């Protein structure tokens, strides 16, 4: 009998993607984050679906419906804690996945990389609209501050902001449409992830050495399925520890108070995974300038493939580029730390200085380091 997984039209696709897929034999644990992101997405969609069954997107009842889920729904507290902390795990994996792509030169698969950047933006949009749904103080004021940035766009800004709000301020119409967006976007992310995989499998996976691995490939199953399963277990362990022992560790205490348009929290800040962008936004005194800087900080990823000057793909054997990469990582951690602090000295001056090395490192220093490393590899040395 002919093996069904190799002949059946549907099984054939799964076989070529997850079973008989030729994979480089030397890919490290840094390549686990793609599958971990897939698992995070499935967890978020499933927990989100059950939460949506009990949530009401109305300004009068949204906050109490979340309290009702946690108190009265069977395991509702667990669903909510898994969903809220699942978002943190999602972004942790995302940042590590993007960092791995930059370090090992995976961005040279341009189509895969560009779809990945679009995915990052879509996930950020989903997380933002999702954070508004519990209708706590920080949800409301976060939505007000961020959507109000649209009014910085010349000519059409105010009209655009009011169109998004569905009125003259963040209110019932805004909450209803944000719930609709938050429900549909994960399915769009799922479709984009399939396209991301499609482009990846056109070229095959990159590997730590950055050289062509065609001479030494192994089947994906059982080697990498077992490796991914270990990653799944570790991620689930961390997520469950977080959701069961310290579910509010990464949240904001202000969000335990219902939204009050007449009372501004002392310090408005987003979730931890947006703090780096928030720090860049606050670093520029001009409203439009801040918006453009935040957009540039994410969209700069799209031009990274064009800035690759090194003869070697990976940073594995490029110590100067490695040093700059880790300085960039430290810079992003600094920005995240600054974004979580109130606007007062010394945080103001650090916040104004920190975005400069971020852009300088990506646009100037790393391309120059690549050229320098090429020069040092010349035979006369």
Curated annotation (Swiss-Prot):
Residues that coordinate or bind a ubiquinone: 201
Gene Ontology cellular component terms for the protein in this record: mitochondrial inner membrane; respiratory chain complex III
Cofactor binding annotation: Binds 2 heme b groups non-covalently.
Residues that, per the record, bind heme b b562: 83, 182
Keyword Transmembrane helix included in the entry's annotation: yes
Cellular localization per UniProt: Mitochondrion inner membrane
Pfam families membership: Cytochrom_B_C, Cytochrome_B
Protein keywords: Electron transport, Heme, Iron, Membrane, Metal-binding, Mitochondrion, Mitochondrion inner membrane, Respiratory chain, Transmembrane, Transmembrane helix, Transport, Ubiquinone
PROSITE patterns: CYTB_CTER, CYTB_NTER
Binding site for heme b b566: 97, 196
Cofactor(s) named in the record: heme b
Major place of residence: mitochondrion
Molecular function per GO: metal ion binding; ubiquinol-cytochrome-c reductase activity
Membrane topology category: Multi-pass membrane protein
Transmembrane segments: 33-53, 77-98, 113-133, 178-198, 226-246, 288-308, 320-340, 347-367
Claim: Nucleotide-binding is one of the keywords in the record: no
SUPFAM superfamilies, per the entry: a domain/subunit of cytochrome bc1 complex (Ubiquinol-cytochrome c reductase), Transmembrane di-heme cytochromes
One BP annotation, GO: mitochondrial electron transport, ubiquinol to cytochrome c
Subunit structure, as described in the record: The cytochrome bc1 complex contains 11 subunits: 3 respiratory subunits (MT-CYB, CYC1 and UQCRFS1), 2 core proteins (UQCRC1 and UQCRC2) and 6 low-molecular weight proteins (UQCRH/QCR6, UQCRB/QCR7, UQCRQ/QCR8, UQCR10/QCR9, UQCR11/QCR10 and a cleavage product of UQCRFS1). This cytochrome bc1 complex then forms a dimer.
UniProt miscellaneous comment: Heme 1 (or BL or b562) is low-potential and absorbs at about 562 nm, and heme 2 (or BH or b566) is high-potential and absorbs at about 566 nm.
Family affiliation: Belongs to the cytochrome b family.
Record's function text: Component of the ubiquinol-cytochrome c reductase complex (complex III or cytochrome b-c1 complex) that is part of the mitochondrial respiratory chain. The b-c1 complex mediates electron transfer from ubiquinol to cytochrome c. Contributes to the generation of a proton gradient across the mitochondrial membrane that is then used for ATP synthesis.
Record's protein name: Cytochrome b
Native organism: Dasyurus hallucatus
């Amino acid at each position: 009998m002919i093996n069904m997984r190799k002949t059946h039209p549907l099984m054939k696709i799964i076989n070529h993607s997850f079973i008989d897929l030729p994979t480089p034999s030397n890919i490290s644990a840094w390549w686990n984050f793609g599958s971990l992101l897939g698992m995070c997405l499935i967890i978020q969609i499933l927990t989100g679906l059950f939460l949506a069954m009990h949530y009401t997107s109305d300004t009068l009842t949204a906050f109490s419906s979340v309290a009702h889920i946690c108190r009265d729904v069977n395991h509702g507290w667990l669903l909510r804690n898994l969903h809220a902390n699942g978002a943190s795990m999602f972004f942790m994996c995302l940042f590590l996945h993007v960092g791995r792509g930059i370090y090992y030169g995976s961005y040279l698969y341009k189509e895969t990389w560009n779809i990945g950047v679009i995915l990052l933006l879509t996930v950020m949009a989903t997380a933002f609209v999702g954070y508004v749904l519990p209708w706590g103080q920080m949800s409301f004021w976060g939505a007000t501050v961020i959507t109000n940035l649209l009014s910085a766009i010349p000519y059409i800004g105010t009209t655009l902001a009011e169109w998004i709000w569905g009125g003259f301020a963040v209110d019932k119409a805004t909450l209803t449409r944000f719930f609709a967006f938050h429900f549909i976007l994960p399915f769009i992310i799922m479709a984009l992830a399939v396209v991301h995989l499609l482009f990846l499998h056109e070229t095959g996976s990159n590997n730590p050495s950055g050289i062509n691995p065609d001479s030494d490939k192994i089947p994906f199953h059982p080697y990498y399925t077992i490796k991914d399963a270990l990653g799944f277990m570790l991620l689930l362990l961390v997520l469950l520890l977080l959701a069961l022992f310290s579910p509010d560790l990464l949240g904001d205490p202000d969000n335990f108070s219902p939204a009050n348009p007449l009372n501004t929290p002392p310090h408005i800040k987003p979730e931890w995974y947006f703090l780096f962008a928030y720090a860049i936004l606050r670093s520029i005194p001009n409203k439009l300038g801040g918006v453009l800087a935040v957009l540039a900080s994410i969209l700069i990823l799209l031009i990274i493939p064009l800035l690759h000057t090194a003869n070697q793909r990976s940073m594995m054997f490029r110590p100067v580029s490695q040093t700059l990469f880790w300085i960039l990582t430290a810079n992003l951690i600094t920005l995240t730390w600054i974004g979580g602090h109130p606007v007062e000295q010394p945080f103001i001056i650090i916040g104004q200085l920190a975005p400069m090395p971020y852009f300088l490192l990506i646009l100037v220093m790393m391309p120059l380091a690549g050229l320098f490393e090429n020069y040092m590899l010349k035979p006369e040395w």
